[in-house]
C-alpha cells in the first residue's frame, strides 16, 4: 500500500482487504463469503459498533436482505451494501454528538 494514500483511501483499502480475509480459500464459489463466515466477520470486526441493539438488529435485517441472488453467499457488492447500511446510522450518531457538543 502506498504511503501517500489519504485517510479515506486507506479506509477503503482496509474494507476491501477485510472482505477478502473472510472469503474461504476452500470455497467452490470464489470471491463470496458464506453467511456463517459473514456473521463471524461482523462479530469480530464490528463488535464495538454493533453492541448497540438497534445496530445489531439493523445488521441482522440487512444480512437477511443482502443475498440478492439467494445463493447463500455474500458477494463483494452485497458486502458493500451492508457497510453502507451500517455506517449510515453511525454517521447520524456522530453528527448528533457533534451538534450536542457545539451547543
Swiss-Prot record:
SUPFAM superfamilies xrefs:
EF-hand
**Which keywords are on file for this protein?**
Calcium, Cytoplasm, Metal-binding, Nucleus, Repeat, Zinc
Binding residue positions for Ca(2+): 67, 69, 71, 73, 78
- Ranges for domain EF-hand come to 12-47, 54-89
**Which Pfam families does the protein's record reference?**
S_100
Give the UniProt entry's GO cellular component terms. cytosol; extracellular space; nucleolus; nucleus; perinuclear region of cytoplasm; plasma membrane
Keyword Nucleus found: yes
PROSITE patterns from the entry?
A: EF_HAND_1, EF_HAND_2, S100_CABP
**Gene Ontology annotations of biological process type:** response to calcium ion
Q: What is known of its domains?
A: S100A16 proteins, but not other S100 proteins, have only one functional Ca(2+) binding site per monomer. Upon Ca(2+) binding, undergoes conformational changes leading to the exposure of hydrophobic patches which could be implicated in the Ca(2+)-dependent nuclear export. Binds Zn(2+). Ca(2+) and Zn(2+) do not bind to the same site. Does not bind Cu(2+).
Protein name according to UniProt: Protein S100-A16
**Originating species:** Bos taurus (Bovine)
- Organism classification: Eukaryota, Metazoa, Chordata, Craniata, Vertebrata
Amino acid at each position: 500500500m502506498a504511503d501517500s494514500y489519504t485517510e479515506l483511501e486507506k479506509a477503503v483499502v482496509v474494507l476491501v482487504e477485510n472482505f477478502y480475509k473472510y472469503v474461504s480459500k476452500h470455497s467452490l464459489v470464489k470471491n463470496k463469503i458464506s453467511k456463517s463466515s459473514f456473521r463471524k466477520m461482523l462479530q469480530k470486526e464490528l463488535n464495538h459498533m454493533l453492541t448497540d441493539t438497534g445496530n445489531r438488529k439493523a445488521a441482522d435485517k440487512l444480512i437477511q436482505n443482502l443475498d440478492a441472488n439467494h445463493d447463500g453467499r455474500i458477494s463483494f457488492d452485497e458486502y458493500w451494501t451492508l457497510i453502507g447500511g451500517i455506517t449510515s446510522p453511525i454517521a447520524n450518531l456522530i453528527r448528533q454528538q457533534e451538534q450536542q457538543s457545539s451547543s
